[in-house]
Structures are given as C-alpha cells and as structure tokens.
Amino acid sequence: MLRLDHLYSIPRDKKDINNICARMCLDCMRNGYIEANEKHTFSLLYEDDAVEFIYQVVKNKLHEKFLYQLSSDHVVSELELASMVQKAMNSTANVITISGDISRCVLSGKCFEKEYGVHAFAKPDEIIEKMAAYMLKHKGVFVEEDQLQLSWWQKLWNKWKWLLSVLVPFAENLI
C-alpha cells in the first residue's frame, strides 16, 4: 500500500486544479489575493517523482513492508507556498494570513528511501514557476473558462493516442 503526500502537478485546464499550489495560482489570478494558513505545514510530492517511486515499488517483487509513505521530505508552510506563488506569478497580490489550528501533515518517506534508495528530485519552487508560467499563458482557460486552443496535430494526437496505447503492448507481446 502506498500513501502519497500532497501530490501536485501542473494543471492543463480548470478541471485539473486539484492541489493547493494550483489553487493558490488560480486565486492569485482571479481574486488578486492568496489565502494561507501560517500554521499549516506539509510536504509536497510532484507527480513525476510519484511515478518514479511507484515504478520502483512495482519493479521489485519482494518488499520489506506492507505500507510505504511517498514524500519529498521538503517541508513547507502554506505561507511560504503563497510567497513562492506570488513571486512566480510576478504579482503584487496580497497574501492573507488565516489563523487556524497548528497542523503538520508530513509523511515520512525514510523507510521507502532506505529500502529503495530513491528520493524526490523536483524542487517545489521550480515547478511552481513552471505552473505559474503555464497558467498565466493560458489565463483564459483558467479564469474565463475558455477552451484550450490546440493545434491540428495536438487534436489529432488526443483523438488517436488510445490506439497507440493499445498497439504498443500488443507489439511487445508479438516480440
């Protein structure tokens, strides 16, 4: 069993906003302010790192433990994250501090790292810069809910990529 700690990714449109980083970017663009609880700390795990971690588990047949916690072990507070978003978006948006209960939501990935020798490579500030750049470039998709304008080859790829995902395993079985 795998537990993923605060998984985040770069959203492609508004329906993909399912993590705190993307929500803060959207709030910054739409509302002009970002709300953050200064007493809430957590660890972020980027999707590429999660995929690598899961691959390592699937690749090995024998496991020392039943439960692994996948975490980047890079602890950040909501206030620090809001500051990163503000900087990445080149914004003068206000960061509104919300007082709440002290909470620390950090899973320890030490057992996984010890057994598999793998650690997270993604740096949250670099990924947030990429996320902010993408969301600002496609502001209409996120704020005004316009449709993402794709080129003809991207539309073709999106329509037919299922075929490739079926044919590759079929070809592997033939070989």
Q: Which sequence ranges carry the predicted segments?
A:
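C-terminal substrate-binding subdomain of Rossmann-fold SDR/epimerase-dehydratase oxidoreductases
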Residues: 36-162
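Intrinsically disordered, low-complexity segments enriched in polar/charged small residues
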Residues: 8, 160, 164-167
